[in-house]
UniProtKB/Swiss-Prot annotation:
Reported cofactor(s): [4Fe-4S] cluster
Organism: Pseudomonas syringae pv. tomato (strain ATCC BAA-871 / DC3000)
Keywords: 4Fe-4S, Cytoplasm, Iron, Iron-sulfur, Metal-binding, Pyridine nucleotide biosynthesis, Transferase
Official protein name in the record: Quinolinate synthase
Enzyme type, top EC level: transferase
Enzyme Commission number(s) of this protein: 2.5.1.72
Subcellular location, principal: cytoplasm
Length: 352
């Protein structure tokens, strides 16, 4: 299975670097100009929780949304705007286009990818699936349009447990891709029969259980929130394991005043916005410097800058295109996910 080269990761960090930090006045100029372009072009901006805070704030103040990948997809699908600007990584832009082929979809950069996507090339994955034709193919949203088109179901970390549990109840055996840590977590929680692809997120794989234990000893009153893309030893230390939205909800719900958070630090913008009286601490990674591959912030998410956002709107560049032949097969597993989660919401509302 495909391994991510260190050279590729280094290049991602270099590409994410700003030539210079923007002053508050420059930031205000870019934000006003982007807001005007969005209005002029009948466009709405959706941003992921892992983008830099200034990008998340811009999406909110222009009538867009900041969300996890599931809600980004749902919002893009339901919003009446004719153009969608996706601040995130490439698979998110592709997902918006698959669900809205009639809309124009742009991204600040097309170079913003994902180690999970890159580590699951469609030719290798299709060959793997062909070896096990009796199994239901479930892929994480962090995959290319071509891989989604090979799948029976697409899931996010927010709905993966429930969907796999439902498939297991139907007696189905599963191929899971690409995140092995999330796959193992689901396997442990559900007992499902799953064959796992060997992929990992460069951010979450860096969290270390020993250092997390040491940090917990320093802050015994803190609750530990962990994303399920993290290694098993880190997950075992968690008070709450969940998707980005589930972690944010836990921060609001739990009485703790302090939280140690094992996910991309971009999420702190929304956590601090919703819980201004609480303290959030980054869970420890391999450490800063040469030993640190992500330092708890995705280098590709960091490529979504104000300059690139304005440039893409003004020049009409970085438009997302998905091969038309892929769309019918790719939309099917995505729509299954949206239908399943919508039905679950209605059931939950009925039981409230």
């Amino acid at each position: 299975m495909t391994q991510i080269s260190e050279r590729f990761l280094v290049q991602a960090h270099l590409d994410a670097k700003q030539p210079k930090a923007l002053s508050p006045e420059e930031q205000a100029h870019y934000r006003a100009a982007i807001a005007a372009e969005l209005k002029k072009q009948d466009a709405v901006m959706v941003a992921h929780y892992y983008c830099d805070p200034v990008i998340q704030a811009l999406a909110e103040e222009t009538g867009g949304c900041v969300a996890d990948s599931l809600e980004m997809a749902r919002f893009s699908n339901n919003h009446p705007a004719s153009t969608v600007l996706v601040a995130g990584v490439r698979f998110m832009g592709e997902t918006a286009k698959i669900l809205n082929p009639e809309k124009r979809v742009f991204m600040p950069t097309l170079e913003a990818t994902c180690s999970l996507d890159v580590g699951c090339p469609v030719d290798e994955f299709s060959a793997f699936c062909d070896q096990h034709p009796e199994r239901t193919v479930v892929v994480y949203a962090n995959t290319s349009a071509a891989v989604k088109a090979r799948a029976d179901w697409v899931v996010t970390s927010g709905c993966a447990l429930e969907i796999v549990e439902s498939l297991m109840d139907n007696g189905e055996k599963i191929i899971w891709a690409p995140d092995k840590h999330l796959g193992r977590y689901i396997q442990r929680e559900t007992g499902a029969d799953m064959l796992l692809w060997d992929g990992a997120c460069i951010v979450h794989e860096e969290f270390k259980s020993k250092q997390l234990e040491d940090m917990k000893a320093l802050y015994p009153e803190a609750a530990i929130l962990v994303h399920p893309e993290s290694p098993e030893a880190v997950i075992e230390l968690a008070d709450v394991v969940g998707s980005t939205s589930q972690m944010i909800a836990a921060a609001q719900r739990l009485p703790n005043k302090m939280f140690i958070v094992a996910t991309d630090r971009g999420i702190f913008y929304k956590m601090q916005q919703l819980c201004p009286d609480k303290i959030f601490i980054e869970a420890p990674t391999a450490g800063n410097g040469a030993a640190c591959r992500s330092c708890a912030h995705c280098p590709w998410m960091a490529m979504n800058t104000l300059e690139r956002t304005l440039q893409c709107l003004r020049e009409g560049g970085n438009e997302i295109f998905v091969e038309p032949a892929l769309i019918p097969n790719a939309v099917r597993p995505l729509q299954r996910m949206l239908d399943f989660t919508q039905a679950a919401r209605l059931r939950q509302a009925g039981n409230a």
